Swiss-Prot record:
Pathway annotation from the record: Metabolic intermediate biosynthesis; chorismate biosynthesis; chorismate from D-erythrose 4-phosphate and phosphoenolpyruvate: step 4/7
SUPFAM superfamilies with a match to the protein in the record: Aminoacid dehydrogenase-like, N-terminal domain (SSF53223), NAD(P)-binding Rossmann-fold domains (SSF51735)
Name of the protein: Shikimate dehydrogenase (NADP(+))
Subunit and interaction comment: Homodimer.
Pfam families per UniProt: SDH_C, Shikimate_dh_N
Active-site positions on this chain: 76 (proton acceptor)
Residues annotated as binding shikimate: 20-22, 72, 97, 112, 232
Taxonomic superkingdom: Bacteria
UniProt: NADP(+) binding residues: 136-140, 230, 253
Reactions the enzyme catalyzes: shikimate + NADP(+) = 3-dehydroshikimate + NADPH + H(+)
GO cellular component, one term: cytosol
Role this protein plays: Involved in the biosynthesis of the chorismate, which leads to the biosynthesis of aromatic amino acids. Catalyzes the reversible NADPH linked reduction of 3-dehydroshikimate (DHSA) to yield shikimate (SA).
EC number: 1.1.1.25
Gene name of the record: aroE
Source organism per UniProt: Pseudarthrobacter chlorophenolicus (strain ATCC 700700 / DSM 12829 / CIP 107037 / JCM 12360 / KCTC 9906 / NCIMB 13794 / A6) (Arthrobacter chlorophenolicus)
Amino acid sequence: MSQRTESYLVGLVGDGVTPSLTPPMHEREGDVQGLRYLYRPIDLLELGLAGDSVGEVLRSARTLGFNGLNITHPCKQLVLQHLDEVSPDARRLGAVNTVVIRDGRFIGHNTDFSGFAAALASGLPGARLDRVVQLGAGGAGSAVAYALLSAGAKTLDLVDMDAERAAARAEELSGFFPDSTVTARTTADLPQLMPLADGLVHCTPVGMAAHPGVPLDLELLESRHWVADIVYRPIDTELVQGARAKGCDVLDGGRMAVGQAADAFRIFTGLDADPERMRSHFLELVAAEEVAA
């Protein structure tokens, strides 16, 4: 008697998601685990849809038998009003990037924060968290800050070009983590902050292929610092290269991308992904992109 192979249909909803590396990462892990796993980008720009159409996309996915969707810009906040249930951490963050469709209900999660937490634990085990400087307090930065504080960061200095945004984020996070100190800072404060810091986390677009450069003066880095970047295209950003040259322990952005994907895979399937196997495949995909370019 033949056994039926478990099958999954999932998608990625957002603007400009067609080139994303997330679908092939998921599909390869599904193949290795003996699943029929199909992951499709649902590019709102290509479809001529606005971000506020995400509710319609969710309902269509349910009708078509999707098991779940990953959600990215510009829909992570917009999707909240269409969900039946939201995990406590996603509710606190006010953003959802993973929706599982179960028994006709939409259940939201946030694997941005859990993906970074997993990356930090695996890529920088034992990193000191007495004081951390974080560059960028936007959407991704909020999730990373939440992960750092959840991991035990005692003092977190949020540095952002938008002082009001940094202040609002610091106040919000202080409410969630009353035993930690969260401060809003500006780039002008970095020369005073870095000598006091154990580590630096970078959460701005600087370093991406379209935004080359470094987000701070590399002379502020010391070999005792650890440095984490969430940019992964390219994987070796100028910050990562500069920090490595200074002798710092370094966490590249690919670790968070893989952590996000592994957590979403588990949410969709109920099966644990192998993060190191997924990272190996991720690095293959990035290398192939760089060769093609």
